[in-house]
């Protein structure tokens, strides 16, 4: 991971345009190829970012970050205060809570509950940056990566996107490769981002998968 703290301005050119005026910011360049710009606020959320895969061209204090859709982040560095690179190694990822772990087991037995025609290839398929929950095959023989969450949010979409970049480069897998975020509930923001990236969303019923009757209020 490369950490650059600099006074900079940022311009995004793509489906729309956006401009961040000059200020001191943190620029993160991760091993997966993503680039994000952060201020000293907004918790973990970046001011702007470019998801992998992308190409970074540096020249005369200007970074041009371009993705496959030809969208660009242009970062103009006026004063670099810090620039360092660190090898963080392979992250083991978050341990799933009890419900997520059980959902993974249940959906591995019933991948068709995610999408008709899915069959399981392997659970916990290693990508090099963490394991994708379920690696499946659809009726056409294409590879489908499934990330399972209790609640589907933007973080889950980002995680699945990173896995897909690795899987698309895996010559051992049948192509094309697509992804599905499966969860008990999925936020509108996550659905929008998933659709923008060509990912599928599947809402699964935990109780139904466990063979339980739905909870219906009664008078007695």
UniProtKB/Swiss-Prot annotation:
Enzyme class: hydrolase
EC identifiers of the protein: 3.1.-.-
Main location per the UniProt record: cytoplasm
CDD domains, A to Z: NucS-like
One Gene Ontology MF term: DNA binding
Keyword Transmembrane belongs to the record: no
Keyword Lipid biosynthesis: no
Highest rank taxon of the organism: Bacteria
Record key words, sorted: Cytoplasm, DNA-binding, Endonuclease, Hydrolase, Nuclease
A Pfam family per the record: NucS_N
Any one GO CC term of the record: cytoplasm
Compartments where found: Cytoplasm
Function, as annotated: Cleaves both 3' and 5' ssDNA extremities of branched DNA structures.
Family classification: Belongs to the NucS endonuclease family.
Protein name per UniProt: Endonuclease NucS
Protein species of origin: Frankia casuarinae (strain DSM 45818 / CECT 9043 / HFP020203 / CcI3)
Organism placement in taxonomy: Bacteria, Bacillati, Actinomycetota, Actinomycetes, Frankiales
């Amino acid at each position: 991971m490369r950490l650059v703290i600099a006074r900079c301005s940022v311009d995004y050119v793509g489906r729309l345009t956006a401009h961040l005026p000059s200020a001191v910011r943190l620029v993160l360049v991760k091993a997966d190829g993503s680039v994000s710009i952060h201020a000293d606020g907004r918790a973990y959320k970046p001011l702007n970012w470019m998801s992998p895969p992308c190409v970074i061209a540096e020249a005369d204090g200007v970074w041009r970050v371009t993705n496959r859709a030809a969208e660009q982040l242009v970062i103009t560095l006026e004063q670099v205060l810090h620039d360092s690179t660190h090898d963080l190694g392979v992250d083991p990822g978050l341990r799933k809570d009890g419900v997520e772990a059980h959902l993974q087991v249940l959906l591995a037995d019933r991948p068709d509950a995610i999408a008709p025609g899915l069959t399981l290839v392997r659970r916990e398929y290693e990508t090099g940056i963490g394991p994708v929950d379920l690696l499946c095959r659809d009726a056409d023989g294409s590879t489908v990566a499934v990330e399972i969450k209790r609640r589907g949010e933007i973080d889950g979409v980002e995680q699945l996107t990173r896995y897909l970049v690795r899987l698309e480069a895996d010559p051992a897998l049948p192509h094309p490769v697509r992804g599905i975020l499966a969860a008990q509930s999925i936020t509108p923001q996550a659905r929008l981002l998933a659709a923008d990236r060509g990912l599928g969303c599947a809402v699964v019923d935990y109780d139904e998968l466990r063979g339980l009757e739905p909870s219906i209020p009664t008078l007695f």
